[in-house]
């Protein structure tokens, strides 16, 4: 395959399918009203924006987004923020909600079934390669490099993988590989004896939930899987182990295609599926030199852009000036004479006078009343925090009134605040 074909033409032969129908139950009340990919992240984005931005920046402009659980917020975001692709140039984002296309008795029953139920749509576009993506991880990756690796390998399936510590293997699909990167085993969330990377005893390759298939091979796998009554119709549990058994799976280490690719620096990839992981990944952005660069003009993260006035920091009525350090604030925010450190404020947040806020993630349209003290708190959209409230200092009170993790991060939602006001 010549360089021109490998670098320029392959992406035209591919279509991406972003799986965005999951609830994300480990995020507890954050997903009461929205799917996990629609959860806010990074001061102005939604989680799904990272996978979609990777597609666009990689040249992949034929995209389907598969939705199911509480999809209104996600669909509205995609319609408002991702409608700029040009259909006349064969660019599109197709929204694919569960609609019982092939089975009038079932909605999507698993990740593989979600793709199978849209198999007629995939076939109508005629891609040579199908890129299956999880819509709920935070990372920057050039899919065109992985696509080229897949096409040149001769394998029918390529699985994106990230290097992790062996003690974390219980939370991921773990693959064993040989010296040529052929996947020789695939174990979903092993409790012990996880296969390690050749040459190491304490590192494993975990699946990123990113798969590239030769399209005809994928269709055959899905049509066979759907007839298997023992199958859970899931890529990690059923499809990938089948591909491995047929010796058709190649491992693609994230370090080969991460953005940017820096020798000796571990690439940034986060599964933000728990409150602790979500909080930590958001606060990563408040570091002096964050590992994830959202200011990169060469690999921008796209999102819906609401027209808002600039953020404003002003003294309180007594002339006391606030102190703001290592904090990201989005458009429409107003802060009066308060101390805020290592935090993120999404759009239209109001912080009234005398507050002390540390290591907090504050989502859109939150009002923080006067003289509040907040530490290690995630505040969901639309909360009105009463004046004088203290959260994050008393573990017993926090656990009684809100959701508190074992690591001390406190989740606050509008429903929790309303119930507290009624007591």
Swiss-Prot record:
Catalyses which reaction(s): alpha-D-glucose 1-phosphate + ATP + H(+) = ADP-alpha-D-glucose + diphosphate
Protein name listed in UniProt: Glucose-1-phosphate adenylyltransferase
Quaternary context: Homotetramer.
Chain positions recorded as alpha-D-glucose 1-phosphate binding sites: 108, 173, 188-189, 207
This protein's record includes keyword Nucleotidyltransferase: yes
Family indicated by similarity: Belongs to the bacterial/plant glucose-1-phosphate adenylyltransferase family.
Pathway: Glycan biosynthesis; glycogen biosynthesis
Domain of life: Bacteria
Coiled-coil stretches: none
Pfam family, one: Hexapep_GlmU
Alphabetical UniProt keywords: ATP-binding, Carbohydrate metabolism, Glycogen biosynthesis, Glycogen metabolism, Nucleotide-binding, Nucleotidyltransferase, Transferase
EC number: 2.7.7.27
HAMAP family reported for this sequence: GlgC (MF_00624)
InterPro entries with a match to the protein in the record: ADP-Glc_PPase (IPR011831), ADP_Glu_pyroP_CS (IPR005836), GlgC_bac (IPR023049), GlmU/GlgC-like_hexapep (IPR056818), NTP_transferase_dom (IPR005835), Nucleotide-diphossugar_trans (IPR029044), Trimer_LpxA-like_sf (IPR011004)
GO MF: ATP binding; glucose-1-phosphate adenylyltransferase activity
Functional note: Involved in the biosynthesis of ADP-glucose, a building block required for the elongation reactions to produce glycogen. Catalyzes the reaction between ATP and alpha-D-glucose 1-phosphate (G1P) to produce pyrophosphate and ADP-Glc.
Classification of source organism: Bacteria, Pseudomonadati, Pseudomonadota, Gammaproteobacteria, Thiotrichales
Protein's organism: Francisella tularensis subsp. tularensis (strain WY96-3418)
